[in-house]
Design a protein with these regions (language model features):
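The feature captures the conserved acid-bearing segment of alpha/beta-hydrolase catalytic domains
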Residues: 72-73, 79-157
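Short loop/turn segments at strand-loop or loop-helix junctions that form parts
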Residues: 1-7, 77-79, 114-121, 170-172
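Short glycine-enriched nucleophile-adjacent loop
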Residues: 56-67, 184
Length: 194
């Protein structure tokens, strides 16, 4: 069981870090990709990934703390909270779990579509993290997402790092995976022959 999959098994959603976790997921997708690449004789060296809500939390932290550099593109949306590039403790920030500069360069330079629903603004949503660290990021998912995206822009500018993420706020969209997928799919499928 991966109760804390959204933090890669590195911390609880309240911020308690796990130093010796045997269930760290920092290389999990890479292992699956390697297996399927071998089993089906896939010729590609990269893959594209999508995460919604808790999956979005997983994907952005996987890209931050993972060892895998085979993610070509990602689309993430509607996370309830994020790991900011700031001095907050993990999983809300990186102060006690720093990231190597080369990894940050890689993370910020990936092609990522960051999608928020304009109507994903319920501060009392049943699955929204209501811990103090998450509430500091904003009242609801849309606010927290805007804050996170702006944090990444500012970090990249201050540190003169490339930033290739795209922001999309979708009118009328609430916390809905089907509609989020419709917005992510054209981006993730662009340029593929299928």
């Amino acid at each position: 069981s991966f109760l804390y999959y959204n933090t890669l098994g590195l911390a609880s959603s309240s911020g308690k870090t796990f130093k010796n976790s045997k269930t760290k997921l920092t290389n999990s997708i890479s292992s699956f990709f390697t297996f399927f690449k071998s089993k089906y004789d896939l010729k590609t060296e990269t893959y594209r990934i999508f995460g919604f809500s808790g999956g979005s939390q997983f994907v952005h932290r996987y890209m931050m703390y993972g060892k895998d550099e085979r993610v070509e593109m990602a689309a993430i949306g509607s996370a309830g909270w994020y790991t900011f590039l700031n001095n907050e403790p993990f999983p809300f920030g990186i102060t006690n779990m720093p990231i190597d500069k080369n990894r940050l360069d890689w993370f910020l330079s990936r092609e990522v579509l960051f999608i928020l629903g304009k109507n994903d603004n319920d501060p009392n949503h049943s699955s929204l993290n209501s811990n103090y660290g998450a509430k500091k990021q904003g009242a609801h998912r849309h606010q927290r997402g805007e804050s996170y995206f702006n944090n990444l822009i500012n970090y990249a500018e201050i540190n003169e790092m490339p930033f290739r993420w795209r922001f999309r706020s979708v009118e009328g969209l609430d916390h809905n995976i089907e509609e989020m997928t419709k917005n992510a799919a054209p981006f993730l499928l662009s340029g593929l022959e299928y």
